[in-house]
A protein has these predicted regions:
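Serine-esterase "nucleophile elbow" of acetyl-processing enzymes
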Residues: 1-52, 57, 63-71
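Alpha-helical cap/lid subdomain in secreted, periplasmic
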Residues: 38-43, 61-184
Length: 184
């Protein structure tokens, strides 16, 4: 994990601030966020700062080491898939640690939009939704976006933009970003 931390810290020296950051675990580390943002011609940076071995115990330290200095506009939290045993053993501790992470992010960056992203477990997703609601964050269930056709959407978006149509949006379109990241 130390190698990954060092890599992210070096990348952060060149990274733009005020973007979208995916903070996930496991296979999330393989999502090429910046390349997908470039391919879909997003006009804001999207970074993947996910870790193998990320858990609720080390999440705050990893956030501080690799994300805090990016001053992200939005953080996508995709944490919980590897926590089923912990959740089953102590649901209250799971909830407290997740809420502590969210509160820490809000303390470090008061303007940061935090999105709790669903995992592939209905029981934990119910808890994640509760956590998101109780901390005034967004919860997005990505299970319904698995059938999305990214190439078709990219073609339509490109066509609409070449026609001169620009949509007004004062925040980054989270649902679209999640579709891009989790269905590539």
């Amino acid at each position: 994990m130390e190698t990954q931390i060092k890599k992210y810290q070096e990348l952060n020296d060149f990274a733009l601030k005020n973007g979208v950051v995916l903070f996930g675990e496991g296979i999330d580390t393989d999502i090429p966020a910046s390349e997908l943002a470039q391919s879909f011609e997003l006009d804001y940076p999207v970074y993947n700062r996910s870790f193998l071995g990320l858990n609720l115990e080390n999440s705050i330290a990893l956030y501080d080491s690799c994300i805090k200095n990016l001053m992200p506009d939005t953080v996508l939290l995709h944490i919980g898939a590897s926590h089923l045993d912990f959740f089953n053993e102590n649901k209250v501790a799971f909830e407290q640690k997740y809420i502590s992470l969210i509160e820490h992010i809000k303390t470090m960056n008061k303007k940061c939009r935090i999105v709790v992203v669903s995992i592939d477990n209905k029981t934990i997703n119910q808890e994640l939704k509760y956590i998101a609601d109780s901390t005034k964050c967004e919860f997005v269930d990505i299970s319904s976006i698995k059938v999305w056709n990214p190439q078709a959407t990219k073609n339509v978006t490109t066509f609409v933009q070449t026609m001169g149509v620009r949509k007004y949006c004062n925040r980054k379109p989270i649902y679209d970003i999640l579709k891009i990241l989790f269905t590539y």
